[in-house]
A protein has these predicted regions:
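Structural motif
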Residues: 55-56, 84, 94
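A short, N-terminal "cap"/entry segment at the start of jelly-roll beta-barrel domains
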Residues: 1-29, 33-34, 40, 61, ...
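Short, surface-exposed coil-to-beta transition loops
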Residues: 44, 82-83
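Glycine- and acidic-residue-biased ligand/ion/polar-headgroup-sensing regions
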Residues: 44-63
């Protein structure tokens, strides 16, 4: 992911742990305390997110619109290359998901 700042934020960054990074995929575990964020980034590959815990997320989009998303633990979703956003833990509990990028 390439990061580029869109809006000023006082939030702290989540923890990211690279699990796999090879010629075919990149797998990263993201761990958030409440109100932590990924920071602004653009996805350079198609990707799949699998929620490890329930994930109550606020997604900040480049157009200034925010989207609230709740993903149940164990559920997954897929997105295409080029998505630009900042992901924030909008809940009161820690949240964790695994991102699988397909190179």
């Amino acid at each position: 992911m390439a990061h580029n700042e869109k809006r000023f934020s006082l939030r702290t960054s989540c923890t990211s742990i690279m699990l796999v990074d090879d010629e075919r995929s990149r797998v990263t575990r993201f761990e958030f305390q409440p109100d932590q964020e990924t920071g602004w980034h653009e996805h350079e590959y198609d990707y799949v997110i699998t929620a490890i815990t329930d994930c109550d997320m606020k997604i900040e989009n480049p157009d200034g619109e925010d989207t609230s998303v709740f993903v149940n633990a164990g559920d997954a979703y897929r997105r295409n290359t080029g998505v630009k956003h900042n992901v924030i833990n909008n809940g009161k509990l820690p949240m964790t998901f695994v991102e699988i990028e397909l190179k």
